[in-house]
Regions:
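Acidic, proline/glycine-enriched N-terminal capping motif
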Residues: 1-80
Length: 80
């Protein structure tokens, strides 16, 4: 990808204790720390030339029965 992109990420952590599936996680790690690592690795893997191309980000953390990371990247066009 060469131009600006939008990055949508959902961090899904294993359900534990009193937490329920789909509940937002409001504890550490911080989303900014998670995102920095992810964007650096995605740059290294060749998803884009530079993580500065990420012009829009949506980041959420959840407790989930099925843990993992959901990632969607889309190129952004010019705003009218």
């Amino acid at each position: 990808m060469r131009g600006p992109v939008q990055l949508l990420v959902k961090w899904c952590f294993p359900v534990c204790g009193r937490h329920r599936n789909g509940e937002y996680r409001a504890t550490r790690p911080d989303t900014d720390n998670l995102q920095k690592l992810l964007k650096d690795e995605m740059t290294h893997a060749g998803f884009w030339r530079d993580d500065a191309q990420v012009a829009s980000e949506i980041v959420e953390k959840f407790w989930a029965v099925t843990p993992g990371i959901y990632i969607a990247v889309r190129e952004l066009g010019e705003k009218p």
